[in-house]
């Protein structure tokens, strides 16, 4: 039998030293918080306009935030579908208005359309 070859320990390059700051701690990148946009402050403002003496729990606020996100997503999906049907590359206020009429029920759709029209008019006039 042939003698086994001796294994040499693989030589690794020495690890780079950590940079030391003036305070003596190691220099690390700070983790930045991922900002999540919510409608919580706006929901709270509307609640105080309608019922100034009533509060809302954090869980209920989270549910309302999810509801608004879901509704906006439905409107965006429907308006993009309408633009595709009409072979238009752009979603205009007309597609949004029609999508709102399709997504929201009855009287709520009428109020949403009138408030949206009012907001667009105010935006274009300023």
Curated annotation (Swiss-Prot):
GO molecular function list: DNA binding; protein heterodimerization activity; structural constituent of chromatin
Tagged with keyword Disulfide bond: no
PROSITE patterns for the chain: HISTONE_H2B
InterPro entries named in the record: Histone-fold, Histone_H2A/H2B/H3, Histone_H2B, HISTONE_H2B_site
Cross-referenced Pfam families: Histone
A cellular component annotation (GO) from this entry: cytosol
Region annotation (Disordered) ranges: 1-34
The protein's role, per its UniProt record: Core component of nucleosome. Nucleosomes wrap and compact DNA into chromatin, limiting DNA accessibility to the cellular machineries which require DNA as a template. Histones thereby play a central role in transcription regulation, DNA repair, DNA replication and chromosomal stability. DNA accessibility is regulated via a complex set of post-translational modifications of histones, also called histone code, and nucleosome remodeling.
Protein's recorded name: Histone H2B.5
Native source species: Arabidopsis thaliana (Mouse-ear cress)
Higher taxonomy: Eukaryota, Viridiplantae, Streptophyta, Embryophyta, Tracheophyta
């Amino acid at each position: 039998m042939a003698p086994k070859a001796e294994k040499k320990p693989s030589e690794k390059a020495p690890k780079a030293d950590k940079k030391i700051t003036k305070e003596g701690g190691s220099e690390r990148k700070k983790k930045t918080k991922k900002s999540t946009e919510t409608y919580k402050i706006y929901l709270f403002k509307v609640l105080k306009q309608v019922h100034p003496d009533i509060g809302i729990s954090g869980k209920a606020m989270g549910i309302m935030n999810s509801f608004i996100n879901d509704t906006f997503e439905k409107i965006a999906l429907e308006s993009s579908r309408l633009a595709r049907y009409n072979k238009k590359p752009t979603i205009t206020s007309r597609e949004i208005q029609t999508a709102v009429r399709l997504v929201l029920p009855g009287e709520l759709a009428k109020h949403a359309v009138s408030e949206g029209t009012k907001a667009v008019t105010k935006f274009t006039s300023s």
